[in-house]
UniProtKB/Swiss-Prot annotation:
Annotated protein name in UniProt: Aldo-keto reductase family 1 member C3
Matching Pfam families: Aldo_ket_red
Organism: Pongo abelii
Positions bearing the site annotation: Lowers pKa of active site Tyr: 84
Cellular compartments annotated: Cytoplasm
Amino acid sequence: MDSKHQCVKLNDGHFMPVLGFGTYAPPEVPRSKALEVTKLAIEAGFRHIDSAHLYNNEEQVGLAIRSKIADGSVKREDIFYTSKLWSTFHRPELVRPALENSLKKAQLDYVDLYLIHSPMSLKPGEELSPTDENGKVIFDIVDLCTTWEAMEECKDAGLAKSIGVSNFNRRQLEMILNKPGLKYKPVCNQVECHPYFNRSKLLDFCKSKDIVLVAYSALGSQRDKRWVDPNSPVLLEDPVLCALAKKHKRTPALIALRYQLQRGVVVLAKSYNEQRIRENVQVFEFQLTAEDMRAIDGLNRNLHYFNSDSLASHPNYPYSDEY
């Protein structure tokens, strides 16, 4: 890895770069953009690239990685590539085929990390969000411990170097950790995490179990109308973050990213803007003081931008518990 690429050691012995590039974009953004920005991100110094079946961009992201390998910029082992198992594939017999399909799209031999994208199982099939005639999402009931066993088999088969989860709460993590015959612990839990929703209790729990917390929406969110309330406050306009940005001569986004790194959180920086992609790698060039960190801690208001109200009645809805 690049020297500026600080990494964290995972509980299975592999290493994950602490700064990642998030590739999700709303459907109205042309897929070709994902190819372009992922190449830019690798050129800017990002080595950790985060995708998923849900994002419908694995072909483009895989092509970007392969083209940067082909032109000699990086080797495959320099890149840490993540994909995720979507909720319609939780039944154990569907897990490996889903990963193989993701690999085929990206044209890669393995992923560095494969995550269960969400604990909320949905009716199997090709539709990402299966609904009934009334437009209600159709749930599936799957024992996630059996899903996890299928994930472990993917690791044993060499299709995924590491395996983890996403959007799990403490109880859901404990269910996996306490599973009889557990072979591999999840290496991480990727969750929405930013100064307005800092997940400090979940972070402490994960640290106590040697599970890395990975932050998505670390810069707030791109306010996709399908999930995000347009009236929610804009994180990067927060006066405290803006004042700290001024103090350190950085952007509010860099303050929000640096905050996570200093609390031991791996952070995903999602941007489709070339200048901001280059800017975000400056996160290693400065430090926040203990006082700065306390000021940002004080912004927490348990605000999650991603409001999956249509899923709130799901038995595995992660926000039903305190953390």
